[in-house]
């Protein structure tokens, strides 16, 4: 199963990008041994439309163009479901074992995600009720993906 992160907005050079790349590389090392075929990251430019509804619609269209049929769509949203790391790992493992071709994680821009896109998701995931900058959400998501792989592998990184 291939994992994909689609994020509205680009990470500039700096500590967030370095940390994101570190977790991605760590996942690649352990993920392949677990039957994951890699982790792709696609950055979508933020819409420059004047109103939020138009911005979200334009960003949703760009996201939809990158979402393959048959994959498990996971949106990140403050109204989503909070799951612990073990449950997140178990869900990724189930999708892998069910031969789901890919899991696609979507991080919205400053205005969030279009409600229609959130409704299409198999899982709407939250990192709590707080609002986080999209740069931090990307790092947090990549860390959780790496952590999930270590849980599935029985690696000591996760000590719960």
UniProtKB/Swiss-Prot annotation:
EC top class named in words: transferase
One Pfam family linked to the record: SPOUT_MTase
Transferase as UniProt keyword: yes
Gene3D superfamilies per record: 3.40.1280.10
Subcellular location as annotated: Cytoplasm
Enzyme Commission no: 2.1.1.177
Catalytic activity: pseudouridine(1915) in 23S rRNA + S-adenosyl-L-methionine = N(3)-methylpseudouridine(1915) in 23S rRNA + S-adenosyl-L-homocysteine + H(+)
InterPro entries cross-referenced by the UniProt entry: Alpha/beta_knot_MTases, RlmH-like, tRNA_m1G_MTases_N
Molecular function GO terms recorded: rRNA (pseudouridine-N3-)-methyltransferase activity
GO cellular component: cytoplasm
UniProtKB keywords: Cytoplasm, Methyltransferase, rRNA processing, S-adenosyl-L-methionine, Transferase
Positions of S-adenosyl-L-methionine binding: 76, 108
Assembly behavior: Homodimer.
Database matches in NCBIfam families: PRK00103.2-3, PRK00103.2-5
Family, as annotated: Belongs to the RNA methyltransferase RlmH family.
HAMAP family on file: 23SrRNA_methyltr_H
Reported function: Specifically methylates the pseudouridine at position 1915 (m3Psi1915) in 23S rRNA.
Protein name: Ribosomal RNA large subunit methyltransferase H
Organism expressing this protein natively: Rhodopseudomonas palustris (strain HaA2)
């Amino acid at each position: 199963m291939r994992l994909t992160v689609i994020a509205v907005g680009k990470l500039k050079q700096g500590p967030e990008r370095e940390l994101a790349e570190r977790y991605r590389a760590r996942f690649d090392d352990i993920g392949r041994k677990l039957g994951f075929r890699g982790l792709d990251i696609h950055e979508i430019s933020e819409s420059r439309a004047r109103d939020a509804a138009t911005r979200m619609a334009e960003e949703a269209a760009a996201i939809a163009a990158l979402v393959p049929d048959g994959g498990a769509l996971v949106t990140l949203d403050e109204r989503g479901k909070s799951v612990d790391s073990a449950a997140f790992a178990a869900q990724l493992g189930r999708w892998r074992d069910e031969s789901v071709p890919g899991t696609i994680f979507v991080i919205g821009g400053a205005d969030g995600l279009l409600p229609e896109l959130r409704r299409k998701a198999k899982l709407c995931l939250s990192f709590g009720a707080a609002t986080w900058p999209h740069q931090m959400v990307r790092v947090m998501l990549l860390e959780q993906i790496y952590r999930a792989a270590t849980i599935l592998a029985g690696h000591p990184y996760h000590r719960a």
